[in-house]
Amino acid sequence: MNAWNGDDDKTAEAITYAQRNKIRIKPPRFRHSKAEYYFDAEERAIYRGTSSIKFLNEGVSNELYDMRDEELNSFVDLLYKLKDTGINARQLEILIKLGYFEEFGNACELLKIYNLFDFFKNGEAKTVAKSKIENDNILFGIVSRHANETTKQFNKLDCHAILDEIESYIRTLQIKDLSMKDKIANDMEYTGSISTITGKEEDRPKLIILDKRMLISNRGKDAGKPWGVAITTQSLGSGIQSSMTVDYKQYCKEKFDIHDIIYLKKFHKNNRGYFIVDNYERIFI
């Protein structure tokens, strides 16, 4: 896999092969992932390398891995530490969207915290005009507790204290994570394959649509008309990919698009060895 960094098709093929042989592919995660893919024999798992992520490079990947033993009490603490590395805003946002920092919270929570970190000039702001935050009573109150106040602005900001309180407040909001479809789209955009796999038995029948193709009849009175839909799927629970066929009339009752998720209720294998979907429903998670 390391030899194919940057080749999305080859990497996707290798990942599919590994999954079919029951070798788990673990997504990039802070404290665990190195720049390159590596195989953990004890866990029988391959950890994705962070340098395989678009716009990431080996230098930044190694800097992140070097931080694996850092004692960090919050995401804000991490953001301050990251200022000493070469990571840029685009790279950081991509990692957040991919769940790389999930130990600190879900992607939507962390993006909100990061946006405010950026608003306060990467935690270094000395002043802020009241007019910029007067429409946010919570933020206005937090800043007022950690700064001096004049008629038009707050100055002598204790940014770290402000951002710590902001993070604590955001965690009370119970902000929902990205939808599964958004996570899948992010996986595809930034890594070229889907690493969103839960490992849960109950999620095995939940199938991500990777590809679909209309099957057209070429004989008889129905020539030129579609009779079925050939689909390639990936199990959300196991990561295993499969090829199946859906009857066109059934498809018309509940259509789906690429990266949608369907719940497979019933299927069979016909006498030609093809898997036929008998019943399914499109789900939103």
PLM regions: where:
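Noncatalytic, beta-rich nucleic-acid-contacting surfaces in large DNA/RNA-processing enzymes
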Residues: 1-285
